[in-house]
Amino acid sequence: MGKMYRYPHDYCPYCYHKIETYSFYCPKCAGQHPETAIIQPDKNIPLDYRGIPLCSNCGSVMRICCSNDACRNQNNIIPPEPTAVVAIAGFSSSGKSTYLLDVVASKSSETGVLVSAKSHALIEWREQNLHRIQQSDVLDSTQKHADNFSSVVGFQSVAKKDCEEIILSLTDRPGEESQEMERLASLNYLFCADYIILLLDLLNLPGMSEELRAKDIDFPQQEATAQSNEIAIENIIGALEQQQGKKGKKIPLFIGVAKWDYAEKADLCPLGFSIGCEGADTTAVLDAKGRLDKKRWNLNSNLIRNFLMQHNEGNLVNKAERYFKTVNYYAFSCFGAAPQVKSGIVTPPIHHPRHIMDPFYWIMKDMHAL
C-alpha cells in the first residue's frame, strides 16, 4: 500500500461521527457554531480531490461535530488531520488501556519524537493505575463520565523524515469490547480506521490455562471470557461489511497475542522465537539502521499464525484471512515478564514492555516514514 492520506478531514476527532458539510464547530471560534463551509464538496469529483470545508470565519481546517456537547467542551485538542487512524479492538481482558499507555510511554522515550499529552486524563490514568500495572493487579474497566461521553486519552507523536510529519493519535474509550455486535457497530472510529489491531489474551486461548497449570505456571486469576475469540473477528467483519462493504477488506489487520511472557515462561514458543521475556530477544523487527526488516517481520508473523492454528484458533485465522487482504500477527508483553504467583501472592516483575510497537513500525513503513 502507498501512503495513506485522510482528505478531507470529514470526521470529529473526539466521537468520530461524520461531520456534515454545513454543520461543524470550529474550536478556534468558540461560541460561533455551527460554522458555514466555504467550499462545498462536489460529489462528481473523487473523494481524494474534493475541497475540504473550512471555517468561514478563520479558515481553519480543524472541525468538531455539533451533535455532541461533550465534543465542544474538550480542550485537549487531538491533531486535526492524523496521518492514520488505528483502531484497537479486543475483549476487556486483552488489556487495551494498558497497551495504549505503554505505547505512549514507549514513544515518549524515542529520540526525535515529540509527544504532547494534552489531556489530563492521561496523567490521571497514569497516577491511578500505573502502580497497579506494576503490581499486576486487574484494572477496573474504563469508565464513562456522567454525561455518557468517553474520556479521551490523546497524544501527538510527530516523527520527521524526508520533511514529512507522521502524527499518531490514540484515544481510550470505555466498554467497547468486540464480543457485542451492537456495541461494535456503534464504534465510529472503527469505520474511520486505516488500520485495525485486534488484541487476544493468551490466557483465553482454548486450553491455555490448563496447559500452563500442567507446567506448574501460576498466573493471576481473571474472569473467563464467555465467548471465543472467533466471535470478535466475526463481529469486526460484520460491522465493517455493514458500514463499508467491500472497502473494509482493504484495511490491514494486525492480530496481537498479549501476555506472551507466559508462553515463554512455560516454554511454549515456536522454535527459535523469543521476544526476550525469558532470555535473548531473537525477533527484533528493526535492523541495525532502524529500518523494518521485512524478512524478520514475515517470519515472526508466520510463527505466531501457526501458534494460533496449533492452539485451536484456526477458525479465527481462516475467517480473518478470508475477509482481509492483509493480515499480520505478532506477540507482545506489556509487562515484559510474567509475575511470580505463589499462594495467591503476586510478586510483580520489572515493568518493561516488549514488542508493543511492532505494528506501528509496520504502519510507518507502509506510509514510507520508516
Specify the residue positions occupied by each region the protein language model found:
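Flexible phosphate/Mg2+-sensing switch loops adjacent to catalytic phosphate-binding sites
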Residues: 76, 108-144
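Beta-strand-loop-alpha "switch" segments that mediate conformational coupling across diverse proteins
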Residues: 318-340
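Switch II of P-loop NTPase G domains
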Residues: 146-197, 203-211
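Hydrophobic anchor at the beta1->P-loop junction of P-loop NTPases
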Residues: 86-88
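Conserved C-terminal guanine-recognition region of P-loop GTPase G domains, centered on the G4
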Residues: 186-288, 300-322
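Long, basic/Gly/Ser/Thr-rich N-terminal segments
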Residues: 1-80
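A conserved segment at the C-terminal end of the G1
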Residues: 98-109
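Conserved glycine(s) of the Walker
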Residues: 94-96
